[in-house]
A protein has these predicted regions:
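Eukaryotic scaffold repeat domains enriched in small/polar residues
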Residues: 7-18, 22-421
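Juxtamembrane low-complexity tails/linkers enriched in Ser/Thr-Pro and polybasic
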Residues: 1-4
Length: 421
């Protein structure tokens, strides 16, 4: 029956093309019509940007590069950002009232918000904490990166600065719980205080190598560490003690640390992850999706590290690569996979079973629904999408879920609210 229907569609489409040519319609019209016909029957989630979310922060606070995002079991949205952290791009001098640490204020605007920010579902800022504290029993990352709240309410933070070879664990209100790994463990024999140097060690069972992000597997009480900006592995840890239980590199092989050089489109697939290994997300069915960002690919494994398959995404993307972060739709089967692409500036929507890209939204720019360095992506219990932006983007955005509907364009552009059009 499906073949008969498909055959009829082909005949109808051919007739439309012939009719269009007879009336002298343009080739571009024909191409657009062909795309619509090809996508007939394809369904995907629909989203609209919420330009009024989140609400303004107090105290003239602003965000720096916003490089971590999670949604907890209360649908509170957590981000971590770099305000004026030493050694990072942070905020530009024109964004800060105090240009020189300890110096005078040059005006009212602005001050860096604390690194960890918690928003409720309505967009109100309800929590803020974090940063370096003199005499603290932990070492705040040189360059914090990634945040997640686990099933017990603990907050986990990584870091991708030079000295960041550890993970931190706090309570929801910022009380220190544990540090796993030692800061500075990746310093090599040539390193000096004046000129530090570092070397990866993806076989280290006690420390990490610039962690990008952690995924929480609540049922197994495990964390999947994307390790990351210096090491080349996924490391699975026990959430109670931070011990590494297992790890793997690309294709499920033991991780190695050779320098692969720059990614070159058209070359055979790299046999190891490039830096950074930017995410390791676990679906409900146990499939582990690893963001091999500069290799423009997702590698998929089972929980033991057995390689299943890989999917390449926009393989002509250079520099920082196309595969930045991954989240899943909120139906039980997690039918759809969402991907942040911070070079091409899209949120891509895939059918998860086939890993076919159905459509994408967003493009480069500063207005609501646009992106500059879209870095992290997460979903809440209602299926809404949240994104954060690094580099000069420096913000958090919300995209309201509007149900499932037909795909009318592969590239949607800005998903502007229907009520505002």
């Amino acid at each position: 029956m499906s073949r008969v229907i498909q055959s009829r569609k082909v005949r109808i489409g051919s007739a439309l093309v012939a009719l269009a040519l007879a009336f002298g319609l343009s080739a571009s019209w024909l191409e657009q019509r062909a795309v619509v016909e090809a996508q007939a029957g394809v369904q995907a989630p629909k989203f609209e940007v919420d330009p009024l979310w989140p609400k303004p922060m107090p105290n003239n606070w602003v965000m720096g590069q916003t490089i971590g995002l999670t949604v907890d079991d209360r649908d509170h949205v957590w981000v971590i950002h770099r305000g004026n952290d030493p050694g990072t791009a942070g905020l530009d001098r024109t964004e800060l009232a105090v240009v020189t640490p300890g110096g005078p204020r040059v005006g009212e605007c602005c001050d860096a918000a604390p690194p960890v920010l918690e928003f409720d579902a309505a967009g109100n800022l309800v929590g803020s904490w974090g940063g370096r504290v003199a005499g603290a029993p932990y070492e705040w990352p040189e360059s914090n990166h990634g945040i997640v709240v686990d099933h017990k309410g603990f907050v986990w933070i990584g870091g991708n600065g030079g000295n960041d070879s550890h993970i931190l664990k706090f309570t929801r209100d910022g009380k220190f719980v544990a540090q796993y790994g030692k800061a500075g463990a990746r310093r090599d024999a040539k390193s000096t205080p004046e000129k530090p140097s570092y070397a990866a060690n993806s076989m280290d069972m006690d420390n990490f190598g610039r962690v990008a992000k952690i995924f929480i597997d609540a049922k197994a009480n495990e964390g999947y560490v994307a390790d990351g900006y210096m090491n080349h592995r996924v490391a699975v840890i026990d959430l109670d003690n931070g011990k590494i239980k297992r790890m793997w590199g690309a294709y499920g092989k033991p991780p190695t640390d050779e320098n692969l050089g720059r990614y070159v489109p058209g070359q055979p697939p790299a046999q190891q992850f490039r830096n950074p290994v930017h995410c390791s997300e676990v679906a409900n069915d146990g499939m582990v999706y690893v963001c091999d960002r500069p290799n423009d690919r997702v590698q998929i494994f089972d929980k033991t590290g057995k390689f299943i398959k890989e999917v390449f995404v926009e393989t002509n993307t250079l520099a920082d690569g196309s595969v930045w972060d991954i989240a899943f739709s909120k139906d039980a089967a997690q039918k759809y996979l969402y991907m942040a692409d911070g070079v091409n500036e899209h949120v891509r929507i895939f059918d998860r079973a086939s890993m076919t890209e159905l459509t994408n939204f967003g493009y480069g720019g500063r207005q609501p629904g646009m992106f500059l360095g879209v870095h992290s992506i997460a979903t809440d219990s209602k299926g809404n999408i949240y994104t954060t932006e690094t580099y000069t983007g420096k913000r958090l955005q919300k995209f309201n879920f509007k149900g499932i509907g037909p795909v009318t364009a592969k590239k949607q552009g800005v998903p502007w609210p229907t009520s505002a059009k």
